[in-house]
Amino acid sequence: MKAGIHPDYRTVVFHDTSADVYYRTGSTIKTDRTIELEGTHYPYVIIEVSSASHPYYTGKQKEYSKEGSTARFHQRFGNFFK
């Protein structure tokens, strides 16, 4: 491997502020912030959405009735196709 061309890969803490969840994972992201977890200092990145807060993963997503919109379409434009 060539020296000096690869990004600095290190353990980083990502904080999902909407769910107040911390993720400790490897990353090459650059940040000036740090946080202390379990006696060790880590680079710290704030994120707004993660799997802990995204509606798709939490099951709090809205489901729209497809039958209602289809029926409404046929009610408005059904006569044009006959």
From Swiss-Prot:
Q: Name one GO cellular component term.
A: ribosome
Q: Which Pfam families match?
A: Ribosomal_L31
Q: Which cysteine pairs are joined by S-S bonds?
A: none
Q: Which domain of life is it from?
A: Bacteria
Q: tRNA-binding among the record's keywords? A: no
An example Gene Ontology biological process: translation
Keywords recorded for this protein, A-Z: Ribonucleoprotein, Ribosomal protein
State any single GO MF term.
structural constituent of ribosome
Gene3D superfamilies membership: Ribosomal protein L31
Its quaternary structure? Part of the 50S ribosomal subunit.
Which HAMAP family does UniProt cross-reference here? Ribosomal_bL31_2
Q: Which family does it belong to?
A: Belongs to the bacterial ribosomal protein bL31 family. Type B subfamily.
Listed name of the protein? Large ribosomal subunit protein bL31B
